Amino acid sequence: MEKTVKKVKRIEGSLRVPSDKSISHRAIILSSLADGTSIVKNFLKAGDTLTTVNAYRKLGVEIVEKEGVYYVHGKGLDGLKEPDDLLDMGNSGTTTRLTLGVLAGFDFFAALTGDDSLRKRPMKRVAEPLSKMGAKIDGRKDGNLLPISIRGGKLTGIDFFNEKMSAQVKSAILLAGLFAKGDTTVIEPVISRDHTENMLNSMGAYVSREFTKDGYRVTVKKADKLNPIHINVPADPSSAAFFAAAASIISGSHIELKDVLINPTRDGFFRKLKEMGAKVEYKNKRDEAGEIVADIYISYHELKGVKVEPQEVPSMIDEIPLLAIIATQAEGETVITGAHELRVKESDRIKSVIENFKRLGLEAEELPDGMIIRGKQKVKGGIVDSYKDHRIAMGFAILGLVSEEGITIKDADCVYISYPEFFNHLEKVSK
Protein backbone atom coordinates (compact mmCIF):
# COMPACT_ATOMS: atom_id res chain seq x y z
CA MET A 1 0.00 0.00 0.00
CA GLU A 2 1.15 3.54 -0.80
CA LYS A 3 0.20 6.40 1.52
CA THR A 4 0.59 10.13 0.88
CA VAL A 5 0.94 12.54 3.80
CA LYS A 6 0.43 16.23 3.06
CA LYS A 7 1.21 19.50 4.78
CA VAL A 8 -0.95 20.50 7.77
CA LYS A 9 -1.43 23.77 9.67
CA ARG A 10 -0.70 22.32 13.10
CA ILE A 11 -0.86 19.24 15.33
CA GLU A 12 -3.26 19.44 18.24
CA GLY A 13 -5.13 17.10 20.59
CA SER A 14 -4.75 14.24 23.03
CA LEU A 15 -3.76 10.64 22.25
CA ARG A 16 -3.19 7.35 24.00
CA VAL A 17 -0.81 5.70 21.55
CA PRO A 18 -0.60 1.88 21.43
CA SER A 19 0.89 0.02 24.35
CA ASP A 20 4.59 -0.64 24.66
CA LYS A 21 5.88 -3.34 22.35
CA SER A 22 8.84 -4.36 24.52
CA ILE A 23 6.74 -4.81 27.65
CA SER A 24 3.93 -6.56 25.74
CA HIS A 25 6.41 -9.16 24.43
CA ARG A 26 7.91 -9.72 27.86
CA ALA A 27 4.55 -9.91 29.61
CA ILE A 28 3.54 -12.88 27.42
CA ILE A 29 6.94 -14.62 27.53
CA LEU A 30 7.49 -14.35 31.29
CA SER A 31 3.85 -15.08 32.15
CA SER A 32 4.16 -18.29 30.12
CA LEU A 33 6.88 -19.40 32.57
CA ALA A 34 4.96 -18.39 35.71
CA ASP A 35 3.11 -20.70 38.10
CA GLY A 36 -0.51 -19.64 37.67
CA THR A 37 -2.55 -17.20 35.61
CA SER A 38 -1.26 -13.74 34.69
CA ILE A 39 -3.56 -10.94 33.55
CA VAL A 40 -2.23 -8.56 30.88
CA LYS A 41 -4.32 -5.45 30.21
CA ASN A 42 -3.69 -2.91 27.43
CA PHE A 43 -1.64 -5.50 25.52
CA LEU A 44 -0.35 -4.22 22.18
CA LYS A 45 -2.33 -6.12 19.57
CA ALA A 46 -0.02 -5.75 16.56
CA GLY A 47 1.94 -7.95 14.18
CA ASP A 48 5.08 -8.52 16.26
CA THR A 49 3.38 -9.09 19.59
CA LEU A 50 0.77 -11.45 18.15
CA THR A 51 3.72 -13.46 16.80
CA THR A 52 4.82 -13.92 20.42
CA VAL A 53 1.33 -15.03 21.47
CA ASN A 54 1.18 -17.59 18.66
CA ALA A 55 4.68 -18.92 19.39
CA TYR A 56 3.93 -19.58 23.06
CA ARG A 57 0.63 -21.22 22.21
CA LYS A 58 2.65 -23.63 20.04
CA LEU A 59 4.85 -24.27 23.09
CA GLY A 60 1.79 -25.45 24.99
CA VAL A 61 0.74 -22.29 26.84
CA GLU A 62 -2.97 -21.49 27.05
CA ILE A 63 -3.40 -17.79 26.23
CA VAL A 64 -6.97 -16.51 26.16
CA GLU A 65 -8.15 -13.05 25.08
CA LYS A 66 -11.42 -11.74 26.54
CA GLU A 67 -12.56 -8.21 25.74
CA GLY A 68 -9.01 -7.02 25.11
CA VAL A 69 -7.54 -8.60 28.25
CA TYR A 70 -5.06 -11.46 27.88
CA TYR A 71 -5.11 -14.30 30.40
CA VAL A 72 -1.87 -16.30 30.30
CA HIS A 73 -2.10 -19.67 32.06
CA GLY A 74 1.58 -20.16 32.85
CA LYS A 75 3.19 -23.59 32.62
CA GLY A 76 5.96 -22.98 35.15
CA LEU A 77 9.69 -23.16 34.55
CA ASP A 78 9.52 -26.80 33.46
CA GLY A 79 6.21 -26.94 31.62
CA LEU A 80 6.71 -25.87 28.00
CA LYS A 81 6.25 -28.64 25.44
CA GLU A 82 8.20 -29.50 22.32
CA PRO A 83 6.51 -27.78 19.35
CA ASP A 84 5.29 -30.12 16.62
CA ASP A 85 6.10 -27.66 13.83
CA LEU A 86 8.42 -24.77 13.00
CA LEU A 87 8.01 -21.71 15.22
CA ASP A 88 7.37 -18.78 12.86
CA MET A 89 8.85 -15.60 14.33
CA GLY A 90 7.43 -13.38 11.58
CA ASN A 91 9.29 -10.06 11.61
CA SER A 92 10.05 -10.05 15.34
CA GLY A 93 13.67 -10.02 16.47
CA THR A 94 12.54 -9.64 20.09
CA THR A 95 10.39 -12.79 19.97
CA THR A 96 13.22 -14.73 18.33
CA ARG A 97 16.08 -13.77 20.62
CA LEU A 98 14.15 -13.93 23.90
CA THR A 99 12.57 -17.25 22.93
CA LEU A 100 16.00 -18.72 22.17
CA GLY A 101 16.94 -17.74 25.75
CA VAL A 102 13.85 -19.50 27.11
CA LEU A 103 14.26 -22.63 24.97
CA ALA A 104 17.88 -22.98 26.10
CA GLY A 105 16.43 -24.23 29.39
CA PHE A 106 14.34 -27.04 27.88
CA ASP A 107 15.64 -30.45 26.81
CA PHE A 108 13.64 -30.69 23.59
CA PHE A 109 14.07 -29.77 19.93
CA ALA A 110 12.69 -26.59 18.38
CA ALA A 111 13.31 -24.82 15.07
CA LEU A 112 12.69 -21.11 14.47
CA THR A 113 12.24 -19.26 11.20
CA GLY A 114 10.91 -15.88 10.11
CA ASP A 115 10.11 -13.59 7.19
CA ASP A 116 12.61 -12.36 4.58
CA SER A 117 13.77 -9.46 6.75
CA LEU A 118 14.20 -11.48 9.95
CA ARG A 119 16.11 -14.22 8.13
CA LYS A 120 18.79 -11.61 7.35
CA ARG A 121 19.23 -10.42 10.94
CA PRO A 122 22.17 -11.65 13.06
CA MET A 123 21.43 -14.30 15.70
CA LYS A 124 24.96 -15.40 16.61
CA ARG A 125 25.01 -12.60 19.19
CA VAL A 126 22.59 -14.73 21.26
CA ALA A 127 23.49 -18.18 19.88
CA GLU A 128 27.13 -17.92 21.03
CA PRO A 129 26.53 -17.07 24.72
CA LEU A 130 23.63 -19.55 24.94
CA SER A 131 25.89 -22.25 23.45
CA LYS A 132 28.54 -21.43 26.07
CA MET A 133 25.88 -21.97 28.72
CA GLY A 134 25.19 -25.46 27.31
CA ALA A 135 22.46 -25.16 24.66
CA LYS A 136 22.94 -26.89 21.30
CA ILE A 137 22.20 -24.34 18.55
CA ASP A 138 22.69 -24.50 14.80
CA GLY A 139 21.50 -22.51 11.82
CA ARG A 140 22.46 -20.96 8.51
CA LYS A 141 25.83 -19.22 8.26
CA ASP A 142 27.24 -21.13 11.24
CA GLY A 143 24.27 -20.38 13.47
CA ASN A 144 24.02 -16.69 12.63
CA LEU A 145 20.86 -16.69 10.48
CA LEU A 146 17.38 -18.21 10.70
CA PRO A 147 16.18 -20.89 10.34
CA ILE A 148 17.83 -21.91 13.63
CA SER A 149 17.45 -25.13 15.60
CA ILE A 150 17.91 -25.39 19.36
CA ARG A 151 17.97 -28.16 21.93
CA GLY A 152 18.35 -26.89 25.46
CA GLY A 153 19.10 -28.74 28.65
CA LYS A 154 21.59 -28.51 31.49
CA LEU A 155 22.91 -24.96 31.58
CA THR A 156 25.73 -23.32 33.52
CA GLY A 157 25.75 -19.60 34.28
CA ILE A 158 28.24 -17.30 32.55
CA ASP A 159 29.61 -13.77 32.83
CA PHE A 160 28.89 -11.98 29.55
CA PHE A 161 30.06 -8.54 28.40
CA ASN A 162 27.22 -7.09 26.29
CA GLU A 163 29.41 -4.89 24.10
CA LYS A 164 26.57 -4.10 21.67
CA MET A 165 24.35 -2.90 24.56
CA SER A 166 21.48 -4.88 23.07
CA ALA A 167 18.55 -5.41 25.42
CA GLN A 168 17.50 -8.45 23.39
CA VAL A 169 20.88 -10.13 23.91
CA LYS A 170 20.87 -9.27 27.61
CA SER A 171 17.32 -10.56 28.02
CA ALA A 172 18.03 -13.85 26.24
CA ILE A 173 20.97 -14.57 28.56
CA LEU A 174 19.07 -13.56 31.71
CA LEU A 175 16.11 -15.77 30.74
CA ALA A 176 18.47 -18.71 30.17
CA GLY A 177 19.99 -17.87 33.55
CA LEU A 178 16.70 -18.78 35.24
CA PHE A 179 17.49 -22.42 34.32
CA ALA A 180 21.29 -22.35 34.84
CA LYS A 181 23.47 -23.67 37.65
CA GLY A 182 25.26 -20.81 39.41
CA ASP A 183 25.10 -17.08 38.71
CA THR A 184 24.45 -15.59 35.28
CA THR A 185 25.80 -12.06 34.91
CA VAL A 186 25.58 -9.53 32.07
CA ILE A 187 27.79 -6.42 32.06
CA GLU A 188 27.05 -3.45 29.78
CA PRO A 189 29.15 -0.30 29.16
CA VAL A 190 25.85 1.67 29.16
CA ILE A 191 22.59 0.22 30.46
CA SER A 192 20.19 -0.91 27.74
CA ARG A 193 16.42 -1.08 28.28
CA ASP A 194 15.83 -2.98 31.51
CA HIS A 195 12.23 -4.22 31.26
CA THR A 196 13.25 -7.87 31.62
CA GLU A 197 15.03 -7.14 34.91
CA ASN A 198 12.09 -5.08 36.19
CA MET A 199 9.53 -7.75 35.33
CA LEU A 200 11.60 -10.66 36.66
CA ASN A 201 12.05 -8.74 39.90
CA SER A 202 8.29 -8.12 40.20
CA MET A 203 7.70 -11.87 39.66
CA GLY A 204 9.94 -12.88 42.55
CA ALA A 205 13.12 -13.89 40.71
CA TYR A 206 16.53 -13.06 42.16
CA VAL A 207 17.83 -10.00 40.29
CA SER A 208 20.90 -8.10 41.50
CA ARG A 209 21.80 -4.81 39.80
CA GLU A 210 24.68 -2.42 40.32
CA PHE A 211 26.66 0.25 38.52
CA THR A 212 30.43 -0.31 38.64
CA LYS A 213 33.52 1.14 36.98
CA ASP A 214 32.92 -1.34 34.14
CA GLY A 215 29.33 -0.16 33.63
CA TYR A 216 25.99 -1.74 34.50
CA ARG A 217 26.06 -5.24 36.01
CA VAL A 218 22.98 -7.48 36.38
CA THR A 219 22.95 -11.00 37.87
CA VAL A 220 20.22 -13.65 38.05
CA LYS A 221 20.21 -17.03 39.77
CA LYS A 222 18.44 -20.28 38.96
CA ALA A 223 14.76 -19.83 39.85
CA ASP A 224 12.37 -22.31 41.47
CA LYS A 225 9.33 -20.45 40.20
CA LEU A 226 8.01 -17.15 38.87
CA ASN A 227 4.88 -15.62 40.38
CA PRO A 228 2.09 -14.59 37.98
CA ILE A 229 1.60 -10.87 37.34
CA HIS A 230 -1.25 -8.45 36.77
CA ILE A 231 -0.05 -5.66 34.50
CA ASN A 232 -1.47 -2.67 32.65
CA VAL A 233 0.95 -2.20 29.76
CA PRO A 234 1.81 1.53 29.42
CA ALA A 235 1.85 3.43 26.12
CA ASP A 236 4.93 2.93 23.96
CA PRO A 237 7.40 5.87 24.04
CA SER A 238 8.69 4.83 20.60
CA SER A 239 5.16 5.25 19.16
CA ALA A 240 4.50 8.44 21.15
CA ALA A 241 7.74 9.90 19.75
CA PHE A 242 6.24 10.36 16.27
CA PHE A 243 3.54 12.73 17.54
CA ALA A 244 5.97 14.52 19.85
CA ALA A 245 8.20 15.06 16.82
CA ALA A 246 5.31 16.37 14.73
CA ALA A 247 4.28 18.88 17.42
CA SER A 248 7.88 20.06 17.77
CA ILE A 249 8.38 20.98 14.08
CA ILE A 250 5.01 22.56 13.19
CA SER A 251 4.39 26.09 14.48
CA GLY A 252 1.41 26.46 16.84
CA SER A 253 1.25 22.76 17.67
CA HIS A 254 0.73 21.15 21.07
CA ILE A 255 -0.22 17.61 22.03
CA GLU A 256 -0.91 15.51 25.12
CA LEU A 257 0.32 11.91 25.07
CA LYS A 258 -1.25 9.83 27.84
CA ASP A 259 0.11 6.95 29.96
CA VAL A 260 3.55 6.92 28.32
CA LEU A 261 6.35 4.75 29.67
CA ILE A 262 9.21 7.05 30.75
CA ASN A 263 11.69 4.45 31.98
CA PRO A 264 15.11 6.23 31.85
CA THR A 265 16.44 3.53 29.51
CA ARG A 266 13.69 4.42 27.01
CA ASP A 267 12.97 8.17 27.16
CA GLY A 268 16.20 9.45 25.62
CA PHE A 269 14.34 10.86 22.60
CA PHE A 270 12.15 13.10 24.77
CA ARG A 271 15.19 14.34 26.71
CA LYS A 272 16.98 15.07 23.43
CA LEU A 273 13.88 16.82 22.03
CA LYS A 274 13.92 19.09 25.08
CA GLU A 275 17.63 19.77 24.51
CA MET A 276 16.78 20.74 20.91
CA GLY A 277 14.38 23.37 22.26
CA ALA A 278 10.92 21.78 22.23
CA LYS A 279 8.72 22.28 25.27
CA VAL A 280 8.42 18.84 26.89
CA GLU A 281 6.70 18.25 30.25
CA TYR A 282 6.07 15.06 32.24
CA LYS A 283 2.92 15.25 34.36
CA ASN A 284 1.07 12.83 36.66
CA LYS A 285 4.05 10.48 37.13
CA ARG A 286 3.14 7.06 38.53
CA ASP A 287 4.37 3.47 38.93
CA GLU A 288 3.10 0.49 36.90
CA ALA A 289 4.59 -2.92 37.74
CA GLY A 290 8.00 -1.41 38.44
CA GLU A 291 7.90 0.97 35.45
CA ILE A 292 7.50 4.77 35.54
CA VAL A 293 4.57 6.17 33.55
CA ALA A 294 3.53 9.80 32.86
CA ASP A 295 1.41 12.01 30.64
CA ILE A 296 3.68 13.95 28.27
CA TYR A 297 2.86 17.45 26.99
CA ILE A 298 4.77 18.75 23.97
CA SER A 299 4.53 22.21 22.41
CA TYR A 300 6.22 23.69 19.36
CA HIS A 301 9.37 25.71 19.78
CA GLU A 302 12.06 26.38 17.20
CA LEU A 303 14.59 23.54 17.31
CA LYS A 304 18.37 23.66 17.17
CA GLY A 305 20.77 20.95 16.02
CA VAL A 306 22.37 18.64 18.60
CA LYS A 307 24.99 15.95 19.01
CA VAL A 308 23.91 12.42 19.89
CA GLU A 309 26.81 10.70 21.66
CA PRO A 310 27.33 6.90 21.68
CA GLN A 311 26.40 6.60 25.36
CA GLU A 312 23.02 8.23 24.63
CA VAL A 313 22.11 5.84 21.82
CA PRO A 314 20.69 2.87 23.80
CA SER A 315 17.95 5.00 25.39
CA MET A 316 16.71 6.19 21.97
CA ILE A 317 17.88 3.52 19.54
CA ASP A 318 14.46 3.11 17.86
CA GLU A 319 13.87 6.87 17.66
CA ILE A 320 17.19 7.86 16.06
CA PRO A 321 15.85 7.68 12.47
CA LEU A 322 13.01 10.00 13.57
CA LEU A 323 15.48 12.35 15.26
CA ALA A 324 17.50 12.50 12.03
CA ILE A 325 14.32 13.29 10.08
CA ILE A 326 13.25 16.21 12.30
CA ALA A 327 16.87 17.44 12.41
CA THR A 328 16.31 18.62 8.82
CA GLN A 329 13.98 21.25 10.34
CA ALA A 330 16.30 22.35 13.18
CA GLU A 331 18.68 25.32 13.14
CA GLY A 332 22.24 24.11 12.53
CA GLU A 333 23.83 20.71 12.16
CA THR A 334 22.92 17.47 13.96
CA VAL A 335 25.58 14.78 14.40
CA ILE A 336 24.68 11.21 15.41
CA THR A 337 27.43 8.68 16.26
CA GLY A 338 27.62 5.29 17.96
CA ALA A 339 24.40 4.04 16.37
CA HIS A 340 25.83 1.09 14.39
CA GLU A 341 23.06 -1.18 15.78
CA LEU A 342 20.70 0.60 13.34
CA ARG A 343 22.44 -1.30 10.54
CA VAL A 344 20.85 -4.59 11.68
CA LYS A 345 17.27 -3.56 12.48
CA GLU A 346 14.23 -4.33 10.28
CA SER A 347 16.15 -2.47 7.60
CA ASP A 348 19.58 -0.84 7.62
CA ARG A 349 18.02 2.26 9.16
CA ILE A 350 21.01 4.52 8.56
CA LYS A 351 21.02 3.70 4.85
CA SER A 352 17.19 3.82 4.68
CA VAL A 353 17.13 7.38 6.05
CA ILE A 354 20.02 8.60 3.88
CA GLU A 355 18.60 7.08 0.67
CA ASN A 356 15.19 8.64 1.32
CA PHE A 357 16.82 12.00 2.06
CA LYS A 358 18.44 11.77 -1.39
CA ARG A 359 15.05 11.05 -2.99
CA LEU A 360 13.67 14.18 -1.32
CA GLY A 361 16.69 16.34 -2.19
CA LEU A 362 17.78 16.73 1.44
CA GLU A 363 21.42 17.04 2.48
CA ALA A 364 22.94 14.56 4.93
CA GLU A 365 26.13 12.54 5.25
CA GLU A 366 26.18 8.83 6.01
CA LEU A 367 28.67 7.69 8.67
CA PRO A 368 29.54 4.06 9.45
CA ASP A 369 27.76 4.42 12.80
CA GLY A 370 25.45 7.39 12.27
CA MET A 371 24.67 10.51 10.25
CA ILE A 372 25.35 14.22 9.91
CA ILE A 373 22.22 16.18 8.99
CA ARG A 374 22.11 19.77 7.77
CA GLY A 375 19.33 21.81 9.35
CA LYS A 376 16.65 24.24 8.14
CA GLN A 377 16.00 22.48 4.83
CA LYS A 378 12.86 23.01 2.79
CA VAL A 379 11.04 19.78 2.02
CA LYS A 380 9.45 19.86 -1.41
CA GLY A 381 8.11 16.29 -1.26
CA GLY A 382 8.32 13.14 -3.34
CA ILE A 383 8.22 9.36 -3.07
CA VAL A 384 10.13 7.46 -0.38
CA ASP A 385 10.66 3.76 0.29
CA SER A 386 9.72 2.37 3.71
CA TYR A 387 11.90 -0.69 3.06
CA LYS A 388 8.97 -2.45 4.78
CA ASP A 389 10.29 -1.00 8.04
CA HIS A 390 7.55 0.45 10.26
CA ARG A 391 9.74 3.10 11.89
CA ILE A 392 11.00 4.39 8.53
CA ALA A 393 7.42 4.60 7.21
CA MET A 394 6.14 6.52 10.24
CA GLY A 395 9.18 8.80 10.40
CA PHE A 396 8.80 10.01 6.82
CA ALA A 397 5.04 10.39 7.34
CA ILE A 398 5.91 13.00 9.99
CA LEU A 399 8.16 14.81 7.50
CA GLY A 400 5.26 14.80 5.04
CA LEU A 401 3.38 17.12 7.44
CA VAL A 402 5.85 19.95 6.64
CA SER A 403 6.39 19.16 2.95
CA GLU A 404 5.24 21.53 0.21
CA GLU A 405 3.79 18.85 -2.09
CA GLY A 406 3.35 15.84 0.20
CA ILE A 407 5.40 12.68 0.73
CA THR A 408 4.25 9.32 -0.64
CA ILE A 409 5.45 6.27 1.29
CA LYS A 410 5.79 2.88 -0.42
CA ASP A 411 4.69 -0.23 1.53
CA ALA A 412 3.19 1.98 4.22
CA ASP A 413 1.11 -0.91 5.57
CA CYS A 414 4.23 -2.12 7.41
CA VAL A 415 3.13 0.20 10.25
CA TYR A 416 0.92 -2.74 11.33
CA ILE A 417 4.04 -4.26 12.92
CA SER A 418 3.79 -1.87 15.89
CA TYR A 419 1.06 0.74 15.27
CA PRO A 420 -1.94 -0.42 13.19
CA GLU A 421 -3.87 2.81 13.89
CA PHE A 422 -0.99 5.17 13.09
CA PHE A 423 -2.43 6.90 10.02
CA ASN A 424 -5.88 7.21 11.65
CA HIS A 425 -4.33 8.82 14.72
CA LEU A 426 -2.23 11.13 12.54
CA GLU A 427 -5.37 12.29 10.77
CA LYS A 428 -7.15 12.79 14.10
CA VAL A 429 -4.57 15.29 15.44
CA SER A 430 -3.81 17.03 12.11
CA LYS A 431 -5.53 20.42 11.78
Curated annotation (Swiss-Prot):
GO biological process: amino acid biosynthetic process; aromatic amino acid family biosynthetic process; chorismate biosynthetic process
Keyword Transferase among record annotations: yes
Location relative to the cell: Cytoplasm
EC number: 2.5.1.19
Binding site for phosphoenolpyruvate: 21, 93, 121, 168, 349, 391
Record-listed 3-phosphoshikimate binding positions: 21-22, 26, 166, 168, 318, 345
Pathway this chain belongs to: Metabolic intermediate biosynthesis; chorismate biosynthesis; chorismate from D-erythrose 4-phosphate and phosphoenolpyruvate: step 6/7
Quaternary state and interactors: Monomer.
PANTHER family: AROM/DEHYDROQUINATE SYNTHASE, PENTAFUNCTIONAL AROM POLYPEPTIDE
Protein purpose: Catalyzes the transfer of the enolpyruvyl moiety of phosphoenolpyruvate (PEP) to the 5-hydroxyl of shikimate-3-phosphate (S3P) to produce enolpyruvyl shikimate-3-phosphate and inorganic phosphate.
Protein name (record): 3-phosphoshikimate 1-carboxyvinyltransferase
Species of provenance: Sulfurihydrogenibium sp. (strain YO3AOP1)
Gene (name only): aroA
